[in-house]
Amino acid sequence: MVAYAGFWLRLVAHLLDGFIISVPAIILVVIIFLTTGASAVFKNFPDGHPDPGDAASEAIGIAFFSAIAVFAVLAVVGSWLYYAGFESSSWQATPGKKVLNLYVTDLTGAGVSFGRATGRFFAKWVTQLIPLGIGYILAGITERKQALHDMIASTLVLRR
């Protein structure tokens, strides 16, 4: 008998994976902030706020937002490689799913390719656009416990 993973198990796995991804990212940001002298920049502003008309303030602002943009790109690429890499591996699961004995398959129960896992990852963005989390809630109410991104990618999340 096939045991589909429902909404709550999948939510816990998602939270675990979010923690696994976020902690190193936060540590990296803090290290970069402290070692590049970026924290000292804010101490040099009167009242801790930059002067909007000052050229140095503008340059710092551009550099700051450029760094944020680079970090955002790296975060997306890192998350994509994390999810698609683990879900297409012999584990068939991210570490968060593995802890809960969950795994990702195609509709026949076979492991997924890196391409399908990539499609599933980016289909989650579509799922996130649906108001009230309905795209995710589908995992609790559909027969095969599929969220919208699972339907788009033709995948299942099963329990061992």
Where in the sequence are the language-model features?
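Helix-coil boundary and N-terminal low-complexity module in membrane systems
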Residues: M1-A25, F42-P50
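Short, acidic, Ser/Thr-enriched surface-loop or helix-capping motifs
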Residues: D106-T108
